[in-house]
């Protein structure tokens, strides 16, 4: 049996992970990943990809796990089944696009022993439904936890895209209400000095990677996303977990797993993701 959450300990492990095309059935126009590896459009390639994603999640043993770039509820359930098989971790599954398939959405895994204290909803007015909210009731105290995937800047229409990002952030802030007992996480698709991220920090949220509870990796940077081809990769920090001041942080981590296969197998995908998972460990008291 895997570890179960205990209300007595009040410690919650929260993971945010962009899994890069976490689909059981890829859209027909997707043939490669962000770092230039081809993506075979086969069942075995996608299933192996999701199994490796589940393996990475299982090592972190999160109580709550938000997943970006998921393609369906079935794909979220596939990851959950692998976590049960490999680690004995049992989760309930949620997906921001409901039963719809074929578009990127946000998946959510909630460890089953948390269910009596939890309620999951879609964030109102969040464009493309790429956000889920979790209300966690601890006695008389209510925590709000949100996982998002903000608009990409891939099309390089920066002004337009950042305006949409700020609109999405506002939808989250509106749902949370007063900045108390709240945690925001996900792929925000922008760097720490950008206006959208400043909108979050100006609303009384602090990034946990910027805190004194952050445990650095040996590589000595805080990159969470990587791009570029033919060995010319570069990194940036666009995945975050933010918290209000009244949420106690035990520690925070960027999980520095190996993302790319040392020897490429043409029948499988060349990397698990162009992102690294971000883990926050909190004491909810």
Language-model segment annotations:
Residues 14-19, 52-77, 134, 145, ...:
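Active-site beta-strand/loop signature of hydrolases that rely on acidic residues for catalysis
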Residues 25-28, 77-80, 119-121, 157, ...:
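Short, solvent-exposed loop/turn and secondary-structure capping segments
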Residues 1-5, 176-182, 189-285:
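Metal-dependent phosphoester-hydrolase catalytic domains
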